Amino acid sequence: PERDGLWIGLTLMEYMAKSGKTLENLIEEVYAVSGPFFYDRWDLHIENDHKARVMEALAAGAYAAFGPYTVQRTETIDGYKCWLTDDEWVMFRASGTEPVLRIYAESNSRSETEAILKAAQTTLYGV
C-alpha cells in the first residue's frame, strides 16, 4: 500500500499525453468501472511491546470486528489486511525500525474511511 508518487505522476502524464485525455477524464473512467473509493493512512506511535501484542493478536485472528465493521476475511501478504462487510478494508503494518503501527483503510467515502480508521484505533488501544 505504499505510494510512489513520482512514478505514478509520470505514468499518468505520459498516458494523458498519448491519449489526449485530461486527469478528470481518467478519474471518471476509473469510477465508471470501480465506483469511487477513498484511501487514508494513519501512523500510530505506540510502544514496541504494544505494537508486538497487536501484531500477535492479528496473527491469531483475535479481531472479529473493529467497532461496527465485521471482518469477513484476512490477507497476510504484506501485513494484515482485513476485508470488511461492504468491500471496505483496513490493513495493519508494523514498522521494523520505529515504534509505529501503520493503519491503512479504504472505502467508498471519505467519512467511512475515517470512521474505519477510528474504529480500528479504538479497538487496538483496548489490547
Model-derived features with residue positions:
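Phosphate-binding and adjacent anionic-ligand microenvironments
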Residues: P1-E106, R110-V127
